[in-house]
């Protein structure tokens, strides 16, 4: 600002060696600033009766509010007290309300300084105008020199910064320091994120030596260890996320080799972590999740099974997405036809793509520690349904994909390599994939094409009777939970 430029000589003569160290030590700058403003050093602030952090902040906000509501004349009288108040906030973690109050104070101070500058510039223009008049009215050199000397003296007098103006300069600088300091604290985890990023090459090299898939390494490079450090998602993580990721890196680096149970679990967690970060920025499925399936195994037949998509917040979405978190496994139904309005050209997607997209939508088992199943209705309708079951036997995950029609099964078999490669990267490590032929003890979900109904109705009823007790109990449990929620 122009007022700061006018006050430049004053600031230059008072900074001394403290200004040289301003970049390397914020405390040195604050001490110098308070000494120039006539305040005590930071080291002396602790004397007297100590107040709690909350009380200190409340008193400071009250003082700032009083200054903002005061008249211009009273504000000038309160400048010194305001400086003392701001000095007490040095090094404190400020909440959003306090930062907003400081922003309001900064705007008010800058507005006040801007008003004083405009007045000062007006007076300066008036002086130069009078000087021109004097030059044109006087022919002698002595008269001209006298006029210039008089004008120079008047200009110097006008350029002198008043005491309230100097205090406003200090207040402005103090507020800027407090706001910037808290911005660094909020980004706060920048040092931790930078430290993790610096170890990225070493971590990736260790993973390559242990035979980790190139797809996983590529995902790490695209999301975490990017070419441009500022693009890394490390800087958008919370402190707890950074701590978890660092712990996961350390664990995988210390494990002797790939193939152990511990390694499989750690690798599953890493893939789930990357998936969660990828899904946060994805716009394809992030705005909607599934509502729980409401049915019983005895009273509702398969033609009544359908899912719906409703927007919910992320916290409730996790609970609704996967009923397996109740501890007994779960069943979810995904209606891809209802999603067709959100997904362009859904009919043109392959069966494998539909399964993969459904897996994404489910955010299935975020940390690879839950089991269950969910059902997908395929597009077009005559393909019927596909059920994906995930089980955990002795710490090893297994996935079974059950097709309700022969045509869907054949299409899935054609794309089985793609499924094997893609599904584990979505959330969990799959140790064994099976795609069995439809048998009598496997349920069929949904309504088949018209030409298949009559032939398969009798078979469907027989298959329903032969469902396993565990699966029937599971559906009963889900139904009971949903009925309780409706009541």
From Swiss-Prot:
Gene3D superfamilies reported in the protein's UniProt record: 3.30.750.140
UniProt superkingdom: Bacteria
Coiled coil: none
Swiss-Prot/TrEMBL keywords: Bacterial flagellum biogenesis
InterPro entries assigned to the protein according to its UniProt record, in alphabetical order: Flag_hook_Flik (IPR001635), Flagellar_hook_control-like_C (IPR021136), FliK-like_C_sf (IPR038610)
A cellular component annotation (GO) from this entry: bacterial-type flagellum hook
Region (Disordered): 144-163, 286-311, 447-487
Entry annotated with the keyword Membrane: no
Start-end of Polar residues biased regions: 300-311
Disulfide cysteine pairs (residue numbers): none
Cited Pfam families: Flg_hook (PF02120)
Keyword flag DNA repair: no
GO biological process: bacterial-type flagellum assembly; bacterial-type flagellum-dependent swarming motility
Protein purpose: Controls the length of the flagellar hook.
Similarity comment: family membership: Belongs to the FliK family.
Protein name: Probable flagellar hook-length control protein
The species this protein was found in: Bacillus subtilis (strain 168)
Taxonomic lineage from the root: Bacteria, Bacillati, Bacillota, Bacilli, Bacillales
């Amino acid at each position: 600002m122009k007022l700061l430029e006018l006050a430049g000589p004053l600031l230059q003569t008072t900074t001394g060696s403290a200004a040289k160290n301003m970049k390397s030590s914020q405390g040195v700058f604050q001490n110098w600033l308070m000494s120039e403003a006539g305040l005590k050093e930071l080291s002396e602030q602790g004397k007297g009766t100590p107040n709690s952090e909350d009380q200190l902040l409340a008193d400071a906000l009250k003082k700032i509010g009083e200054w903002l509501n005061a008249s211009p004349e009273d504000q000038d009288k309160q400048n010194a007290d305001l400086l003392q108040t701001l000095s007490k906030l040095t090094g404190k973690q400020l909440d959003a309300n306090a930062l907003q109050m400081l922003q309001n104070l900064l705007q008010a101070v800058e507005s006040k300084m801007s008003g004083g500058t405009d007045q000062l510039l007006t007076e300066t223009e008036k002086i130069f105008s009078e000087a021109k008049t004097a030059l044109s009215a006087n022919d002698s050199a002595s008269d001209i020199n006298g006029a210039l000397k008089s004008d120079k003296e008047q200009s110097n007098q006008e350029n002198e910064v008043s005491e309230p103006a100097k205090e406003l300069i200090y207040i402005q600088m103090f507020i800027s320091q407090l706001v910037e300091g808290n911005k660094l604290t909020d980004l706060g985890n920048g040092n931790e994120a930078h430290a993790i990023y610096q170890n990225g090459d070493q971590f990736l090299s260790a993973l390559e030596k242990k035979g980790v898939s190139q797809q996983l390494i590529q995902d790490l490079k695209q999301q975490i260890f990017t070419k441009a450090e500022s693009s890394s998602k490390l800087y958008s993580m919370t402190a707890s996320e950074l701590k978890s990721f660092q712990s996961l890196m350390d664990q995988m680096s210390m494990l002797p080799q790939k193939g152990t149970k511990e390694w499989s679990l750690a690798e599953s967690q890493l893939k789930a972590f990357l998936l969660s970060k990828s899904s946060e920025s994805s716009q394809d499925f992030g705005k909607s999740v599934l509502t729980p399936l409401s049915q019983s195994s005895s009273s509702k037949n398969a033609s009544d099974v359908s899912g719906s998509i409703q927007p919910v917040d992320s916290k409730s979405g996790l609970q609704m997405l996967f009923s397996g978190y109740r501890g007994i496994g779960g069943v979810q139904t995904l209606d891809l036809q209802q999603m067709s309005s959100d997904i362009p050209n859904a009919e043109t997607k392959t069966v494998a793509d539909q399964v993969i997209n459904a897996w994404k939508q489910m955010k299935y088992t975020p940390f690879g520690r839950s089991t269950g199943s969910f059902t997908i209705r395929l597009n077009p309708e005559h393909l019927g349904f596909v059920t994906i079951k995930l089980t955990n036997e002795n710490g090893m995950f297994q996935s079974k994909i059950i097709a309700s029609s022969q045509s869907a099964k054949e299409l899935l078999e054609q794309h089985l390599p793609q499924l094997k490669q893609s599904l584990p990267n979505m959330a969990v490590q799959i140790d064994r994939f099976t795609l069995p032929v439809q048998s009598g003890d496997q349920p069929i979900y949904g309504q088949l094409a018209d030409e298949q109904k009559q032939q398969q109705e009798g078979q469907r009823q027989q298959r329903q009777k032969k469902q396993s007790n565990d699966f029937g109990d599971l559906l009963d449990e889900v139904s009971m939970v949903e009925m309780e929620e409706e009541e």
